[in-house]
């Protein structure tokens, strides 16, 4: 989806945008290599932290446990983002929300979007919503009993309002936490 979206910006350039099939992430520490099992914590700002547990050192074999740790890390990362009201747009939620609905205009420093002269898809809608103050939805966190919730789907809240799911994370085996885009209450 990223490569497809980036092709909109190549204009008349004769450039082909693709992503490698074997994309991987590596962490290089400017210190002696820690042993497997050691945790490294990084502060990312806005009350959000990332803890990396060293699962393997270069050339060590991967195990099923590594996959389980990666899945657990991704759930904890998603939960931290939801708790901090930091929406992440995925393939299921692409082009579903105006940036102000998910709080990107309040990201610090300097805001997460520019309202100045620009040329990107949807810029007119984003600027109009900003200058008219006409954003009719906002983000909230909600907890649900463990359920098969899907980002991009609609749910009905206990107070009768409907909301669209932006992000989800499993907190416990019995509870799912979601970042919702909810209509503003009138009145």
Predicted features along the sequence, with ranges:
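Basic, glycine/lysine-rich polyanion-binding surfaces/domains
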Residues: 1-187
């Amino acid at each position: 989806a990223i490569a497809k979206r980036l092709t909109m910006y190549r204009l008349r350039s004769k450039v082909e945008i693709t992503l490698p099939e074997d994309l991987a992430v590596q962490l290089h520490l400017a210190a002696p290599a820690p042993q497997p099992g050691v945790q490294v914590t990084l502060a990312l700002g806005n009350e959000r932290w990332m803890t990396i547990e060293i699962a393997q050192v270069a050339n060590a074999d991967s195990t099923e446990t590594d996959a389980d740790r990666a899945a657990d890390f991704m759930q904890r990362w998603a939960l931290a983002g939801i708790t901090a009201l930091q929406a992440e747009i995925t393939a299921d939620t692409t082009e579903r929300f105006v940036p102000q609905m998910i709080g990107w205009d309040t990201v610090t420093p300097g805001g997460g979007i520019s309202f100045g002269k620009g040329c990107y898809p949807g810029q007119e809608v984003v600027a109009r919503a900003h200058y008219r103050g006409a954003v009719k939805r906002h983000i909230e966190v909600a907890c649900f009993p463990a359920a098969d919730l899907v980002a991009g789907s609609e749910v009905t809240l206990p107070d009768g309002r409907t909301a669209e799911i932006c992000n989800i994370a499993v907190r416990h085996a019995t509870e799912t936490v979601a970042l919702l885009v909810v209509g503003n209450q009138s009145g």
